[in-house]
Each structure stands twice: as structure tokens, then as C-alpha cells.
Amino acid sequence: MKVKELTVEYGNRTIIENLSMQAEFGEIIGFVAPNGTGKTTFFNAISGLIPKKNGNISLNKIDYNSRGATYLKELFFLESSKNLYDYLTPKEHLEYIKAAWKSNSDIEHIFEQLKMKEYQNRTIKKLSLGMKQHVLLAMYLASDATILLLDEPFNG
């Protein structure tokens, strides 16, 4: 992932100004800062959920300006348990992700790897917070995305 001189504004307020960074495959980067300083805004801008004012973003040499399926398939953005639907099962969540990302992942293998087979058919509403976090990780694995963005992964 490569970000060069990223600027993001809300109205007349600049939230991110001229941010540049680069992350190589396999590298883990953390942003530690007080609430309200732009961490979520950064993830939203990279994901194309909000517009950027200036700057260049590329994921695995795929340009942000395309923001098509190829760009978005490289990225998986998790915001705590906001990505989960209470009345679906973990298995249904993974099947949806696999279809949306056109992934070749083996859902049964993912459940085995994460020791989730016993609760793959329970509704999300009936799962503990720890189990829900396992479901989020499983969703990422099912996507085949190469970049994982975690917003407040230890929240809750």
C-alpha cells in the first residue's frame, strides 16, 4: 500500500493533511492516537467510503482512482462488530464474503483452522464478543484480500 500526500476534509475542516506512508506485503502498521484525530477517516478514505481532497493511493499497484472491483478486492476493512448481522450465522457471513470477493477460499477449512466449526451455524446474536471477533477474522480469510484494515480491533 502506498499513500502520498493524502489530504481529507470534512466541509472546511482539514482532518488529514499531506499524509504519506508505505506498507510492504506482510508488514504490520499501527496508528496510535487519541480519539478524533483521523484514524477512522484515514481508513474510510483508503476504502473509498469518503472522498479525498488530494493525494495518491495505490494498493498493490492498483490506483485508487479506479476504485473498481480490482481495487476493492485487495482491501478488507473491519470496524469492530459493525460488519456483522445479528440474525445471520458465521457460515452465512463467510458465504457472502466469498461471493462478494469472488474468492476461492475453503470456508470449511477456515472454520477448522480457527476452531469455529461448533458455532458456525449459530446466529451472531448468540455469540460472545470473542466468538464475534473470530467471525471477523474468518471473514477476512474468506475474502482473499491482501490488505486488512482494523479499526479499533480491541474495542469492547
Region spans (language model):
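Helix-to-loop junction immediately C-terminal to a conserved catalytic motif
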Residues: 47
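Conserved ABC ATPase "signature" region
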Residues: 95, 99, 105-120
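Conserved ABC transporter NBD signature motif
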Residues: 52-66, 70-71
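Catalytic Walker B motif of ABC-type/P-loop ATPase nucleotide-binding domains
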Residues: 148-152
